Design a protein with these regions (language model features):
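Fe-S-dependent hydro-lyases/dehydratases of central metabolism
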Residues: 1-200
Length: 202
């Protein structure tokens, strides 16, 4: 039972509120006007091309039977950074291996030093061991990148960021006994990471 009389209030739509805030370029382009991005929309960082050889350091070793894309890059609180690749990458493996990001960045710094013409002592030691084994490494043609080992990574949603976040942090490869889905393996390839298969534990 309603004890109030209902009267429809008069409503007037004032589109001026929207006209002042939204640019409508239909029929009146302004090519000289610069596009302004929001504070959390960033360009993708430049990625190095694959070289003839690759020096890889495994920075995360995951022994779970399956590793999901949600473990590789969590959803939820990270969604607000989906247009900020570097900021989003800070959450990579945060629930599975919180130290991963720091270790991956350290390896990326080695490659940046190599590109700048400096070989850190850690890399020199590896090259010396390779030369002793009969190899002749060429620093100019050898990327240095990080990698993860997981038994079966990539299960779950087709989350492209599960691969792109690794790449942004300097990821160059993954090692796995098998890949949970073709789409995750394909995403790794599309982002320039080599999806190696390992028949034994590394």
């Amino acid at each position: 039972v309603c004890d109030h009389d209902y009267t429809a209030p008069k409503y007037h739509f004032d589109r001026g509120v929207y006209d002042k805030r939204i640019y409508n370029g239909w029929g009146s382009p302004e090519p000289e006007t610069a596009l302004r991005f929001g504070p959390n929309i960033k360009d993708w960082p430049q990625q190095p091309e694959l070289t003839d050889d690759l020096l890889v350091k495994i920075v995360s070793y995951i022994t779970d039977p399956v590793t999901t894309t949600d473990e590789l890059i969590p959803s939820g609180e990270t969604s607000s950074f989906r247009s900020n690749p570097l900021r989003l990458a800070e959450f990579t493996l945060s629930r599975k291996d919180p130290a991963y990001v720091g270790r991956a960045k350290a390896v990326k710094a080695l490659d940046e030093a190599r590109t700048a013409g400096t070989l850190p002592e850690e890399v020199q030691a590896v090259y010396a061991a390779l030369e002793k084994a009969g190899y002749k490494p060429n620093a100019a043609a050898t990327n240095i990148g990080s990698a993860i080992f997981a038994n079966k990574p990539g299960d779950g949603s087709a989350r492209e960021q599960a691969a792109s976040c690794q790449r942004v942090l300097g990821g160059a490869a993954n090692f796995a006994k098998e890949y949970a889905t073709k789409r995750y393996r394909s995403n790794c390839i599309n982002w320039g990471m080599l999806p190696f298969l390992s028949l034994i534990h590394i």
